C-alpha cells in the first residue's frame, strides 16, 4: 500500500459482481481510490493527489503510532501503513464512512489499523500516546480552530508531529476569511486563514510550524463526480467558465500541508 490501496486474492467472477454491487450500496465514496481485485472504487477525490503532496514533506512514519482525525473511510490510514506505521487509529463519526472502512478492511484484514466512530472531543486517553497526528480537511470547519489544535497536541508525545492539511486564502483577506454562509458550496466553514494567519494561529496555541508544502489550487481533476459518488461535486461549487472563483465569489480553495510540533515548555 505504499503506492496505492490495492488488495488482490482469488475469487470467482460471481464474487466480483456481487462485491461491486454491495460496495455501491455504500455510496457516496468520498476518499479513494481502492482496488479490490478488478473492482475499482473510483471515489470523488483522487486522494492520491493529496497524499503525493504529503510525501513532499518526507515525514518519517516508520514504526510510528499514528492518529488520523476525521479520517473518512480510512484511505489515508492504509497509505500510512504503506509507509511503515506501527499502528493507525482513525476517528470518523460518519457511519457511512465507517461502514466503508469495515468493508475495505474485511478484504485487507489488517490488525494494524482500527477505526472508532467518534469525534476527537470524545476520546479519553490518559497520557499522550501518538507520535504523529493527522488532521486533514478539518480546521476550517472548526468554530474554534485554536481549540482543535490544542486538542490534537494533548494526545501528542513529546517531540511528536501534527500534520495539518487545510485550505488557505490569499493574503488579500489579511489573516482570515470568515464566510457569511457557504464557501465553495461547503456548509459550516467558519474561518479560512491566510498562510500568515495560519502561522499566527499555530503560535498562539504554544505550537511551532516546522515544515510546509506549497499551497495548491483544488481542481476538477482531483475532485469530481463518479459512479461511486454520483452527486454534485466540486465543479458545481465554481463559477461557470471561471475555475478560479467559487460560486460565492471567493478564490478557489488553495490547499496546503503544515507540520507542527509543541514548543519547548509549552502546553
Report residues per predicted region.
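N-terminal accessory regions of S-adenosyl-L-methionine
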Residues: 1-51, 106, 178-180, 199, ...
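A short glycine-rich, Lys/Arg-flanked "PGG" loop and its adjoining helix->strand segment in the class I
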Residues: 146-161
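Conserved class I S-adenosyl-L-methionine
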Residues: 64-72
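Short alpha-helix
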Residues: 190-206
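A short acidic, Gly/Pro-enriched loop at the edge of an enzyme's catalytic core
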Residues: 123-133
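A short SAM/SAH-binding and catalytic strip from SAM-dependent methyltransferases
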Residues: 131-144
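Short, glycine-/aromatic-enriched active-site segment of Class I SAM-dependent methyltransferases
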Residues: 167-189
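Conserved SAM-binding loop of SAM-dependent methyltransferases across substrates and taxa
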Residues: 73-84
